[in-house]
Structures are given as structure tokens and as C-alpha cells.
Amino acid sequence: MTTVTRFAPSPTGYIHVGNLRTALMNWAIARKSGGTFILRLDDTDRERSKQEYSDGIMEDLEWLGLTWDRLERQSDRLDRYAEAADELRRAGRFYECFESPTELDLKRKKLLNMGKPPVYDRAALKLSDEERARLRAERGGYWRFLLDQERIEWTDGILGPISIDAASVSDPVLIRADGQVLYTFASSVDDIDMGVTFIVRGGDHVTNTATQIQIMQALGGTPPSFAHHSLLTGAQGEALSKRLGTLSLRDLRARGVEPMALLSLMARLGSSQPVELFRTHEELLAGFDVSTFGAAPTKFDAEDLFPLTRHYVQGLPFEAVRGRIAALGVPDDLAEPFWRVAKDNIGVLEDLGGWWTLFSEGAEPQIDPEDEDFIRQAMTLLPPPPYGPESWAQFTAAVKEATGRKGKGLFMPLRKALTGQAHGPDMSEVMPLLQKVRAKG
């Protein structure tokens, strides 16, 4: 049987690190097994779903290289959901309710005050036809699925054996009074119709999975296998949801995070395997195993992405960055030497711009007060650009002979005067790249 997985985001916002984890796991399972990966936009919320978010989700996945085999939109399938609702009505598994949100909240609070679980009391099932007709005329009805009050069991791909007593769960609302089809229902119908065989999602969906298993069975479908991964927290264990605004993929991308650095962290975070940098999707897939993930909350720190990004960037061949370097205005004959000098001194590729500015426009000299006279004298011994591979050795030899300085007292002030930095690349490689020197004699 062909493995079919899906990633089903709601286009009510951009992808963040939390749902990226879900996307990556489902993509990896499909790709590793030679199966099908579906991108399904769960866009039945007409008020909050926006095209810009749909476009953004696809752009972010393409940036990561998480390509999909099929694109589906729930907004194209509303007629199918109406058909499925009729099937459930005919089977006696769908019933109309009329409580207002306020009335439901009062029922919930009353049960909690009595120390009971806040499970819907199925009062709507006790209504007579006359009462139902009167309420329907007064207010719009919403629809619940009638659960079989028995244990729902499955073997979870991460959590292991799961058993939930359906009697402890409210009959789920599947269609709102305004006619909006809710996620629990639309997703169940889609997963059956699209032949989904394996679903990975967050641990906050476990109870939802139990109800969806019954919905799928009531529609004559075979539920897929499920795996529920742990939820991410902040670095200190705090709820991540409050910070997701700064952890969208596009925000991380703007900070220079590389796709493979992000995927490498997400492919191992929360698993028993150590985090390591994968340079290709093929390497990542070879080491991916959903069964290695655990149930405990998983700490995420965005700063962990930057050592991985630095490692990835510094290992790139020149051909991979040729276009970016050319866009900076680096002459062709200096492009490869520039990359060789700059690559070990950057954290993200955007740092290249700063290095080329230093070489092309000259650095603001950093001169300690006690070195001012020394630098003035030294600069009189420096010829104008261009410089060659021997220029640094020739320059420092001339300065040493003229001033008597040597060692760190010679080299450090000159480095700071020419580059504005106390540390950096080998000066013998820097000199041929210098187009301008701002320190004066």
C-alpha cells in the first residue's frame, strides 16, 4: 500500500516553527517510503483565511524544499462535506442543537462546580419535533456528531498504545450555526477521500483524533495510522504560543537562517538522536525515524539555529554563492578570493555585504591613542592599492624597519587601522582585496 501523508495548515497566518515540525515529519515519512505528500489548505474559515497566507505557506515550503505532490483546498470541497453530513444524518449519527454560546458556557461551569467533567449533556436529543421546529425558527441550529460511548483505542506511532473513553468526551460540533464546516469534520472527510494512510500532528490533537476515528468509521472509511509529536516550548520551558509572532519561518529567513539548518534542527529536536547538520534532504531522510521522537515537551531556542547556519554557510562551495557575490559588485577576478577570505568570518550569508563594504570602501580605522603616531608613520610607507599576495609582508617589514616595532605591537595596530577589527582573516589574504584604505599617514 502506498503511503499517503498530508500537511493541512489553515491559511489564517504564516507557518511557524511549531507547525513546520508537523510538515517536516509528514513530508519525510512520504518521501522516505516513496509515497505521496499532500498539501491541503484547510480554508473553511472564510473570515480569517486569506490568500496572502496561502501564498506565504507555499512560498515557505518551497524555500525549505518540502515539495508536495498534490495541492488541495477545503474551500473547493464544500459540496462534498454537505454530502457527508447527509450520510451521517441518515445513519443517525448527526444531530441538531440550539444552545447559545452563553448557555453552553453556563452548563460547562455548572458541571465543573459539581466536580464533573464538562461533557455536553445531549439535551438536544431529548427535544420533541415541535420544540426543535420552534427553536430552529428562533435561532440557527448547529450540528454535533453522536459518539458511540465506548473506548477508542489505537497504537500511536510516538505515544504508543492510546485508549480514550468516548463517554468522557463531548460530542464534537461539526457544523456551526452559520453553516461553517469545522476542522474536525472536514479533515475526517478529506483524509478518507484522499486515501491518507499516516498522520503526524501535535500532541494537543490526541482527543480530537479519538473523535475523528469514530467519524471516519461512521462514514465507512478506514482511519489512518496516527503519531502525535510533543509540543514545543520556549528555551525556559515557557509556552511557545505567546512568542510565535517572532518565530515565523519568514522572520527566521529574514534573520539569515538557512533552510537546511532549520530542517536539521527540526528533524532531530525532541528525538533520541543528536542534532546534526544535514547538507541535503537526502541525508536528512536517511537519518529520519518518527519512532525516535518522545512525548515530553520539547524546548526550542531560535539561537540554536545560528551555529547550524554558520556551519552550513562556511561549508558552501564557491559556485553556490557566485551569484550572491556578483550581486554585491565584487569584480570577477576577486570573487573567489573574496569568498575564501570571508566565509570563515560570517555567521549568515547576509554578512558578506559588510565584508565587501570593508574591502571596497575601506574600514573606519580603530587606533588606540598610544598608536596614533605609529600609524601615521606606518601609513606613509603603504603604497596605494591595488595590493598583491606579498603586500602585507612587504608593508610590515618596511614598518618594522622604520619603527623598530615587532610582534603583536607591530601587527595588531596595523590590522585595526586597515580593517577596523582586532581579529579576522589572515592579512596576507585581506590585502589583495582592499580597494581603499581610510587610515591616513
From Swiss-Prot:
Molecular function as annotated in GO: ATP binding; glutamate-tRNA ligase activity; tRNA binding
Intervals of motif 'HIGH' region: 9-19
Organism for this UniProt entry: Cereibacter sphaeroides (strain ATCC 17029 / ATH 2.4.9) (Rhodobacter sphaeroides)
PROSITE patterns in alphabetical order: AA_TRNA_LIGASE_I
Sequence positions that bind ATP: 242
Motif ('KMSKS' region): 239-243
Keywords: Aminoacyl-tRNA synthetase, ATP-binding, Cytoplasm, Ligase, Nucleotide-binding, Protein biosynthesis
Enzyme nomenclature, EC number: 6.1.1.17
Subcellular location: Cytoplasm
Name this protein carries in UniProt: Glutamate--tRNA ligase 2
Name of the encoding gene: gltX2
Highest taxon listed in the record's lineage: Bacteria
